[in-house]
Structure formats: C-alpha cells, structure tokens
A protein has these predicted regions:
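Glycine-rich, basic loop-to-helix element that forms the pyrophosphate-binding segment
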Residues: 90-106
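Short aromatic/hydrophobic "clamp" motif used to bind/position activated sugar donors
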Residues: 111
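Boundary detector for helix-to-coil junctions that initiate low-complexity/charged tails
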Residues: 256, 260, 264-332
C-alpha cells in the first residue's frame, strides 16, 4: 500500500518517498503517559502490557512530574516487563510534553500510546502487527471500547459503574474526522516514518485534542488502515482525566485551534472523497448549502420560540393546513 503522499507524487510522475517497509520487521514502542498520581491505575495499564501475545515491544513510561515520582513508578513496575521498560521524567508544558518526550525514545518500527487510565487487551499489539505486516507504512486503527468508572471521590478508577460501550465507528473516515475526533489515542499504531523523516510532533499549544491534531496531520501523509477488532478499553472516569478536568470552553477553544491548524496547510484526501465533497454543495460564501439551510432553520426556530405571536401564527397556519388536507382526503 502506497501512502497518500506517494500516490499524489506518482500522479505527477514522481517516485515514492515514504513507501518503504521497515527492514527490521514489525516491532513496537509503547508510550505510556502518566502524572504518577494514579499508581494503581498505572499498574493495571502496565499489567495489560505484560500479558500481550505479541512479544516484540518495549515500553516507555513518561512521567509528567518529578524524578522522585519517576523513581516510585520505576520501583513499582511489573517484573514481567523487566528489560523492556524505561521510565522518563518530564516537567513543564501541557499534555503534549510527555508525548513528545516519548517520541524521542521510539526504537520500534511502529509506536502506540496507552494512557494510565487505559487498558490494552491481550491481542492489542498482535492485531496491530498483523495489519502492519500487510500495510507497514500506514497508521493502523483498531476499535476502542469505553466504560464509565467511578473514582469514589479520589483520582484512581475504583470500579465500573456502567456497561462496556462501543461508541466509535469501526472504520477511520478522514472527512468525518475533519469535524470531530472519533478515535482515542490507544486505538492507533503509527509507523515510525511519521516522526522520521516526516518530523511530526504533538502541538504544545493545545491543552486538549493534541492526539486528534497529530492523527489528522499524519493520516493525510501516510493513510490509515482500519481493523474492526476491539483491542483496548478507555475508562471514562468521573474525575481526574481530560474529559472531566478540562472545561467546556477549553475544549471548544482547542477544537477551533485544531481546525485553524488544518486550515493553514493543504489537505490531502483519500481517493474517492472528492465525490463526497461534491455532494455537500458548497456555495460562494464559503459555507456548504447544508450549513446555510441549517443556519436558516435555526434562525427561524429562534424567531418562533422568542416570539409567542409568531409561534401562534405558525401553529394556526399548520393547523389550518392540516384541516384542509383532511377535508380534501374525504372528498370523493
């Protein structure tokens, strides 16, 4: 499978620049991000890595905290990961800081991420590896399931309070991801070429959505192969993770920042998506016809709900029309 970038170059008679399979075979570096404040949860995440059925991987635990916390994490690491685990401490910066520090320690042909509130199923890496063997230069996307967990007033996940759900689509769709993120970070395995030679990094300016921004820029360059297996579990905590820690305005501002960043560079779409774009019927003011129709409908609804007189007139008109239709239906 050629990357989208190589397909574009081939259309202009240029040779591929990225379509090179890793010479050493498929191996993984797993980057685990933690603040070190949830040792039990981190231990469970590392336990899930210790039971992987695919053997060729190393683990980089990046502690967003002090060296002392990193030493505690190192001391409590699962013995089954002995020899393949390193712990790195970073300070300062936001959520991207530990991710970028992890990228500096990637040794595998591919890398993937597991936050300390995520759990990997035993076939997590095996599923990635099987797909990567067929498409070594593409991002591999599996399915992540979610489950609500309570912290009972603390910071650690204590017990599940809901059933396991599957809210994310089975297949990656670049156009759908232009509007919102539909892929948790633990659902993805990236080929190392996105950081070398492409040089992608996580954006330090984003307080949240740093994973969505990184995914979109990488996906347009190398493409995404989807596999339908559910291989990881994202535990939605009632306190302490990004969903609950960041305010709604923070999420909204970060969303706008990601869209702005996407808008500053050319967009490379998969083959076939031009037909879907044509179906949105863009108009000359820059919006799609769907957006214009939706805005008009919302404005009309706003007028009706704000003005009892307009609402009453609209209701009377609809009632009169309904009576007329019934009378017409009774006529021979």
């Amino acid at each position: 499978m050629n990357t989208p970038l190589d397909d574009l170059l081939a259309a202009y008679g240029c040779g591929p620049v990225l379509a090179t399979a890793p010479a050493e075979g498929i191996t993984f570096t797993v980057i685990v991000r933690t603040q070190g404040t949830r040792p039990n949860s981190l231990g469970e995440a590392l336990d899930s890595l210790a039971t992987q059925t695919f053997p060729d991987f190393d683990v980089v635990v990046v502690v967003h905290g002090t060296d002392e916390i990193a030493d505690e994490v190192r001391a409590g690491a699962d013995e089954r990961l002995s020899g393949r685990l390193q712990v790195v401490a970073v300070t300062g910066g936001g959520r991207s800081q530990p991710l970028n520090a992890g990228l500096d320690h990637v040794t595998g042909s591919h890398f993937c991420f597991l936050d300390d509130d995520d759990l990997a199923r035993a076939d997590w890496l095996r599923s990635f590896a099987d797909a990567a063997a067929e498409s070594p230069t593409a991002i591999i996307r599996a399915v992540t399931e979610t489950q609500a967990w309570t912290t009972e007033g603390g910071v650690e996940p204590v017990r599940a309070v809901g059933s396991i759900e599957r809210p994310f689509p089975d297949r990656f769709d670049l156009l759908a991801h232009m509007s919102l993120n539909l892929t948790p970070i633990c659902a993805l395995a990236y080929p190392r070429l996105v950081i070398d030679p492409l040089g992608l990094r996580f954006c330090d300016d984003l307080p949240v959505y740093e994973d969505w921004d990184f995914l979109m820029r990488a996906a347009m360059a190398v493409g995404v192969v989807s596999i339908p297996q559910a291989t990881s579990l994202y535990r939605r905590l009632d306190a302490g993770n990004a969903d609950s820690a960041a305010s709604v305005p923070t999420w909204e501002r970060a969303h706008a920042m990601v869209i702005d960043r996407l808008s500053t560079h050319p967009v490379l779409l998969p083959v076939g998506d031009a037909r879907r774009l044509a179906g949105t019927h863009y108009v000359t003011d820059g919006r799609s016809r769907h957006e214009a129709d939706l805005a008009a409908a919302e404005a009309r609804l706003d007028r009706l709900t704000r003005s009892p007189r307009h609402w009453a007139q609209a209701f009377a008109a609809r009632a009169s029309a309904a009576v007329g239709h019934r009378r017409a239906a009774r006529r021979p």
